[in-house]
Amino acid sequence: MNFRRLVLAITGLASLSLYGCTGAPGRPAPGAIPVDPDEVSDFTALYAQNCAGCHGPDGKGGAAISLSDSVYLSLADDAILRGAATKGIPKTAMPAFAKSEGGMLTDKQIDVIVRGIRERWSKPDVLRGVNPAPYRSPETGNPSRGSGVYSTYCSSCHGPQGRGGQKASSIVDGSYLALVSDQYLRTIVIVGRPELGAPDWRGNVPGKPMSPQDVSDVTAWLVSLRPKFPGQPYPPYPNDVKPTGEIR
């Protein structure tokens, strides 16, 4: 074997050895290597995995409030969105997502979600020249006045007692009221549920938008109807029977 053939043989063996290191059977392709969940930074992926189940794949149409509603996004600032995602909303189905609160997301990932919601769905000028009721009320509303506010602004759709009408369902159902927070009720009164045909505070009575006091009062009325113990009540024990705590 002359020198040239020796060089070619060595080069060939080296190439085969390199291929064996990089192209061995079973070695995953670069794109197939799983990404550390903490490193996911794409808004679409994070929203789909953590938000779409309740808020809808396009930010609307889910059981929870529409995040694609530009009126809502003009009312709720980034601190409100971040706080809800970080700590959840007590006594509701909205869980805490931040790792510091027992969730699965880093603070950076929550920032990505908040920023993505704002960039994708907000319309900064949607409330230009309009003065809606504030997101949070500095004062508690009056339930007695709220009953009258309901009759004026809400009964045409939800019925005279709030138990449902031809256009909308019950908003006084005990199970429903037990699943939502006071703030959720207030927010829905202000921004409506446009994806469900429910108008915001301006559209219930043409030419007569709800005042901030109207919003606070009807919210207080709804809150007053929430049962202390939601669900079907159990019958009380007979007077001559005392509970023993034993299961039989």
Regions found by a protein language model. Give the residues of each.
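Gly/Gly-Pro-rich "capping" loops immediately C-terminal to redox-active cysteine motifs
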Residues: 33-40, 44, 56, 60-86, ...
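C-terminal motif of bacterial Sec signal peptides marking the signal peptidase cleavage site
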Residues: 17-20
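Hydrophobic/aromatic residues in well-formed alpha-helices
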Residues: 6, 80-81, 110, 185, ...
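Flexible coil segments in periplasmic/lumen-exposed cytochrome c-class electron-transfer proteins
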Residues: 25-33, 37, 41, 45-48, ...
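Bacterial N-terminal signal peptides that target proteins for export
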Residues: 1-10
